[in-house]
């Protein structure tokens, strides 16, 4: 089973295995700031329409998320551009004057998005998954953390069906 997430396509390419699916990688970054809030807050960026959230996290606040195209060879880190993007949106709605000095931690992750080659806008790419059987190799493309259990059941059923 090839369930390598963002590295699924690279693993296939390195082993000269063809697939009808392609993937785009999208990096999302989050900030944890020294701010205590009482309840979650959802904001919409006036610049690009993206949804940004603020979630209470003990005595801190989790802010997310960004969405940038990511190349497999690039480091998976929150960039200064992403920090500024999130802080500027929060500060445009709420008079907090948050700066980089308020950031106590940050993290980034890469989402593999499965698509056909005609899709240009990453916000329009489905967050669904695709499963492909290539002889005895099951390849999983895309997916979300929230649908992982369902995806696991589909793969399990595929194994049972194809194990003879």
What residue spans do the PLM features occupy?
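Conserved NAD(P)H cofactor-binding loop of Rossmann-fold oxidoreductase domains
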Residues: 4
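C-terminal catalytic lobe of FAD-dependent flavoproteins
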Residues: 8-63, 68-164
């Amino acid at each position: 089973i090839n369930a390598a997430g963002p590295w699924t396509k690279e693993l296939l390419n390195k082993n000269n295995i063809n697939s009808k699916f392609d993937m785009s990688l999208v990096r999302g970054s989050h900030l944890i700031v020294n701010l205590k809030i009482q309840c979650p807050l959802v904001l919409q960026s006036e610049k690009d329409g993206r949804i940004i959230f603020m979630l209470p996290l003990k005595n801190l606040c989790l802010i997310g998320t960004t969405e940038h195209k990511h190349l497999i060879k690039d480091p998976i880190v929150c960039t200064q551009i992403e920090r500024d993007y999130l802080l500027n949106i929060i500060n445009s709605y709420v008079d907090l004057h948050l700066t980089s000095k308020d950031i106590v931690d940050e993290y980034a992750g890469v989402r593999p998005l499965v698509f056909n080659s005609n899709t240009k806008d990453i916000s329009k790419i489905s967050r669904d998954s695709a499963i492909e059987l290539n002889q005895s190799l099951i390849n999983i493309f895309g997916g979300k953390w929230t649908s992982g259990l369902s995806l696991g059941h589909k793969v399990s059923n595929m194994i049972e069906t194809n194990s003879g």
